[in-house]
């Protein structure tokens, strides 16, 4: 028996006393450490993409815009290429590079390694107010982000570029019921519902999320891709011929090339199945045949193909194995500073993007419009939200229709001038205005 009578104190009272004594420690030590470590006086947002930051323009636009709005921006992704100088010099933006893992040991091992790395990154940056992630990719980042936002005070924003499961579905010959595709769909469908806000690149994608995923439409804002300020048309006073002699491009211009009549085309690609560059190469072969057999007045075409990807080697071989006369194809990998310089020097942009989901729009078309380039693009239904036939571009369904569009574009000056005017009108639609409108609609910022 205790001298002080402590033995008579009930257990529940001991527990109450322990909780009482521990509360200050939890409130002033544990909670700040868990949720406020590194807390900024500014509103803080983590923007993350499982992709190369230097070639993720929309993510970089988000970073610039949030910084301009007064946010402290934590920008995370792969650093495989140069990041624009203005991003590096921005005091409101801090970059957190992620290590890139290959899939040599299988997709599961890759996902596990990525997951551990992401958990470490989220823990380090646990005091953020918002998390914005690009989707796709969905796995493993979306489930992890949902867990983080559930146990912290961060609000989750998903920026929908496409649907992750549809990209995986293409790899399995459009078999939706393939176990991996079905799993990817369920992960996307389930975890998307936990996000606080959603941004989509088209109205069609917003409709899909509402009707198929059951997401509240009030949580979704359409934010069309728009070109950044670095994309701008040539001015009338600019000397295009002199600009084509810049170091990054001069060596690719043939000596016999006449810029007064010959045409420069450009396309950017990630050399993936949803963007069949062989269609463009096939149309150029038909163009060569047309020159040889029917029309020796056809102008020369110089086409720049920029980008990297899994099918690149196959396409390069197709070009190397053909004997070209009227067409010259060059493969480039440009810095984020040189790419806009190239676009404004071209006559036409080409897009082979078809969309695995049929719900997204190619960013490259917006960059081309921003540079005053009319576009020739592979048609699919949602493209009507951006490109109007014979107004700001030309559409095609296969390589023969693309060949016809090439002939129109290089031979019919009236067509060229009409769609050029349309592209110049589109060049006035800019990112900042669209971004402010969408984020204000969701009440993330206040104009």
From Swiss-Prot:
Supply the alphabetized keyword list: Endoplasmic reticulum, Glycosyltransferase, Membrane, Signal-anchor, Transferase, Transmembrane, Transmembrane helix
Gene Ontology CC annotation, any one = cytoplasmic side of endoplasmic reticulum membrane
Query: A GO BP term, please?
Result: dolichol-linked oligosaccharide biosynthetic process
Tell me which domain of life the UniProt entry assigns to the organism this sequence originates from.
Eukaryota
User: Does Endoplasmic reticulum count among this protein's keywords?
Assistant: yes
- Give the InterPro entries listed for this entry: ALG1-like, Glyco_trans_1
The residue ranges for the Cytoplasmic side of the membrane come to 30-127
Instruction: Report the locations given in the UniProt record.
Output: Endoplasmic reticulum membrane
Summarizing the function annotation, the protein's role is: Participates in the formation of the lipid-linked precursor oligosaccharide for N-glycosylation. Involved in assembling the dolichol-pyrophosphate-GlcNAc(2)-Man(5) intermediate on the cytoplasmic surface of the ER.
Q: What is this protein's name?
A: Chitobiosyldiphosphodolichol beta-mannosyltransferase
Q: Which organism is it from?
A: Kluyveromyces lactis (strain ATCC 8585 / CBS 2359 / DSM 70799 / NBRC 1267 / NRRL Y-1140 / WM37) (Yeast)
